[in-house]
Each structure stands twice: as C-alpha cells, then as structure tokens.
Amino acid sequence: MQIWHMEPFPCGDRRLPHHVFPPKKITTTQLGALAGVQYYKVDLEDTASMKKRLSAVKTEKNVTFTDVFTVSETMLDFDDKMEQFYEAQTQKEDVISLVVEGTCYYDVEPEDDSWIRVQLEKGDLIVIPKGLSHRFTTTPQNFVKIQRFFSRKVEGTQG
C-alpha cells in the first residue's frame, strides 16, 4: 500500500497517481490519525493467517456478508461504472475491502477539498469509517478483484 496527498484539482486521467508537488507521502498511522482509516496486510498465500485476520476483522466490525467484486474493461458499461465509482460518497456503515487481485485507488476526504489517495494491491485490507467521504477508481491496468464485507446483505453497493 502507498498513501499520499492528492493535488487539489486533479486534471486528466483519474487513474494516474495525481501526487501534490513535491510528493507528500504519509504512513498508515498518519492515515488512521487523519481520517480514521484502518489498514491490514493479509497474506493470501497463508490460509491460516488469512482466516485469522479476516475472522478478527469480521468480529470487530460485525460482518456477516461478503461478496467478490471484479472491475475490468470487460464489464458491461465499464466507463459509466467508473464514473459512478469516482463520485464522492459516504456510507452508513464502514467500507471494508480486501484486494484479492490487481490494484486500485481509494481516495478519502478527511477535510473539505483535501483528498488522500490510497493505492491498494493484492493482500491489502482497508476499513474506511462510516460517514467519511470517499471514492474509488482503478489504476491504468483497469483490473481489480475485491472481496467486500458487510454487516447486512446489500444489493448493488458500489466501491
């Protein structure tokens, strides 16, 4: 995982990094302090370790449902979906996502017009607290498979 402050008004391809200049990277600890976002690295190759970590998160966050969501250029209405995912939103429950394959960005907004970009890759688990404005996009590879976690069954939830 990599984390940095984004330029205030990114222009062009939103799938690019959009660092401020000079780049201002932050740590997972700083991200937690600034935005309340939690991060865990999950070793997907170590089944016992993975189950232990996921079980702890599920218990702590009262998770009962999961799904696997794949974003790729082959999906129906890909461009429209990407526009929808990039719209800033807040949720009524924590957004919990584990990247199973590929790479993506979650942008979080701890203060008005001050976005932090979180680049996630395979094995990265993120918990975005309810009520925090966030948005989602892919990297230029246009592919990510995410396992999402919910406290209740949710139909049609986006990023």
Swiss-Prot record:
CDD domains according to UniProt: cupin_ARD (cd02232)
Pfam families in the cross-refs: ARD
GO biological process: L-methionine salvage from methylthioadenosine; methionine metabolic process
Subcellular location as annotated: Cytoplasm; Nucleus
UniProt GO molecular function: acireductone dioxygenase [iron(II)-requiring] activity
Keywords: Cytoplasm, Nucleus
Subcellular location, principal: cytoplasm
Superkingdom of this protein's organism: Eukaryota
Gene Ontology CC terms, in alphabetical order: cytoplasm; nucleus
InterPro entries (UniProt xref): ARD, ARD_euk, RmlC-like_jellyroll, RmlC_Cupin_sf
UniProt record similarity statement: Belongs to the acireductone dioxygenase (ARD) family.
Function description: Probable inactive acireductone dioxygenase.
Protein name listed in UniProt: Probable inactive acireductone dioxygenase 2
Species this protein is from: Caenorhabditis briggsae
Lineage: Eukaryota, Metazoa, Ecdysozoa, Nematoda, Chromadorea
